[in-house]
Amino acid sequence: MIASVRGEVIDIALDHAVIEAAGVGYKVMATPSTLATLRRGTESRLVTAMIVREDSMTLYGFADADARDLFGTLLGVSGVGPKIALATLAVYDAPTLRQALADGDVTALTRVPGIGKRGAERMVLELRDKIGPVTTGAGVTAVGGHAVRGPVVEALVGLGFAAKQAEEACDKVLAADPDATTSSALRAALSMLGKK
């Protein structure tokens, strides 16, 4: 198992980064917020989880071990694969997700692309006792009052847009479509910024 990758960031895309370590470029799938912490040409370290399937070997990268461990816990839920687990961590950071699971907040979990009401109920049922310590908080909140705003803004900044420009584009997209998912909001914001 590859537990972490450290090296020069060669490329950053919407859903992955390529990190060169010892002459080998590792494609690491990651959330927009994790990708936003990386810069091309700089040395970075990501904690990783390696998922081996019959037809693929995929690395998933995280900013810290806590997020990686929660990713592994999410994979234990029937019907939740690596893509949905990563999408969940793209919408909610680890403490917020733990709080949603502890509170049984099915509505918050259904905001994650790919998770319906039944899937959210299954997650709460299977993970409520496995999620680890929950920090005290006021329930599930998101940056700017919207669950997808933070990850979308961070992804846009990671792609080279100015923070103010990214925030304005994201706010316009979310004002037009308050129920937008992270991926659809990011696509719409990129389209909007591309027209300027």
Swiss-Prot record:
Annotated keywords: Cytoplasm, DNA damage, DNA recombination, DNA repair, DNA-binding
Pfam families: HHH_5, RuvA_C, RuvA_N
Region called Domain II, residue ranges: 64-142
One GO term (biological process): DNA repair
Disulfide bonds: none
Family annotation (InterPro entries): DNA_helicase_Holl-junc_RuvA_I, Hlx-hairpin-Hlx_DNA-bd_motif, NA-bd_OB-fold, RuvA, RuvA_2-like, RuvA_C, RuvA_C_sf
Region annotation (Domain III) ranges: 151-196
Start and end residues of each stretch annotated as Domain I: 1-63
GO MF annotation, one: four-way junction DNA binding
Gene Ontology CC terms: cytoplasm; Holliday junction helicase complex; Holliday junction resolvase complex
UniProt subunit comment: Homotetramer. Forms an RuvA(8)-RuvB(12)-Holliday junction (HJ) complex. HJ DNA is sandwiched between 2 RuvA tetramers; dsDNA enters through RuvA and exits via RuvB. An RuvB hexamer assembles on each DNA strand where it exits the tetramer. Each RuvB hexamer is contacted by two RuvA subunits (via domain III) on 2 adjacent RuvB subunits; this complex drives branch migration. In the full resolvosome a probable DNA-RuvA(4)-RuvB(12)-RuvC(2) complex forms which resolves the HJ.
Protein family according to the UniProt entry: Belongs to the RuvA family.
Main function: The RuvA-RuvB-RuvC complex processes Holliday junction (HJ) DNA during genetic recombination and DNA repair, while the RuvA-RuvB complex plays an important role in the rescue of blocked DNA replication forks via replication fork reversal (RFR). RuvA specifically binds to HJ cruciform DNA, conferring on it an open structure. The RuvB hexamer acts as an ATP-dependent pump, pulling dsDNA into and through the RuvAB complex. HJ branch migration allows RuvC to scan DNA until it finds its consensus sequence, where it cleaves and resolves the cruciform DNA.
Domain notes: Has three domains with a flexible linker between the domains II and III and assumes an 'L' shape. Domain III is highly mobile and contacts RuvB.
Protein's recorded name: Holliday junction branch migration complex subunit RuvA
Gene name of the record: ruvA
